[in-house]
Amino acid sequence: VEGDTSLILIDTLDSDARAARLKDELSRLTDKPVKTIIFTHGHPDHRGGCGAFRDTVEEIIAFAPKKAVLKGTERINPILNKRTFRQFGYGLTDEELITQGLGIREGHAIGDGVYSFLPPTTLYTEDSVKRTIDGVAFELVSAVGETDDQIFLWLPEERIMCCGDNYYGCWPNLYTIRCTQYRDIAQWIKTLEKILSYPAEALLPGHTAPLIGRDQILEVVGNFKNAIASVFDQTLDCLGRGLTLAETVESVRLPEELREEGKKMHHCVGS
């Protein structure tokens, strides 16, 4: 985002090498430096390139998680890391990897740079913060969903929303097969309803293509929300009836009106 005298960067790519190339591309467009970085959430593929901007950045903004990390989580990190390695196919060749899910392979997985983190200098705990940063109006909104520290950014003058990873063009990881902390699906659905309540004309997700036009945003994000809500409600119903895991898997189906959308998303999964 271009301000009066500087650039405001929303997330930083996933490695120092890729962020350095981004920095070069930005320099061809403007001589304004990146002075502000805003993290949509704490996943490393959104923060890993931050160090490439250490020579100019003055403020790094993030939100604190709405729920504390469960105590003792660090004790299961060895198996979590191993499962993460398997989930994202870090040990596979490009030919062996069928899909990365959300886009191209992460830089550190293929030797294209390493994680280069910088800590936030501004950490908000509020539900919503309005800021004018170098002449650009922002509303930063806490938006629990894929993560408990997730936010979306609303640019009211441009009617643009950056939604982080609470929407992307594939089926979301409602619960990760690598076994991370529980993701609050009911709250995620509420967050998507909140996203839809803003009069955005462009929606920029953290992964996959942007949605342009109010009608497309309402249709695509609305279907995304309704699909999640349907799976969630059906799963709770199965649990209430005492069905086994296998029986639940066989029972849960997307409604007919959402199946075509589901076919577009079923081969991919979020992070």
Question: What function would you assign to each model-found segment?
Answer:
Residues T12, P172-I177, D215-I217:
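Short acidic, glycine/proline-rich loop/turn micro-motifs
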Residues D16-A17, G42-G48, A68-L70, T147-D148, ...:
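Active-site environment of divalent metal-dependent phosphoester hydrolases
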Residues V1-R28, F152-D165:
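Conserved beta-strand hairpin/beta-sheet module of binuclear metal-dependent hydrolase folds
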Residues L123-T125, V129-L155, I160:
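Core dinuclear metal-dependent hydrolase active-site scaffold
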Residues A17, S27-E126:
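Active-site HxH/HxHxD metal-binding segment of metal-dependent hydrolases
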Residues T147-Q181:
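Mobile, glycine- and charge-enriched loop segments
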Residues I10-T12, K35-H43, I61-A64, A143-V144, ...:
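Active-site neighborhood of phospho(di)ester-bond hydrolases with catalytic His/Asp-centered motifs
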Residues I160, C170, Y182-E247, S251-P255, ...:
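Divalent-metal (often Zn2+) His-rich catalytic cores of metallo-beta-lactamase-fold enzymes
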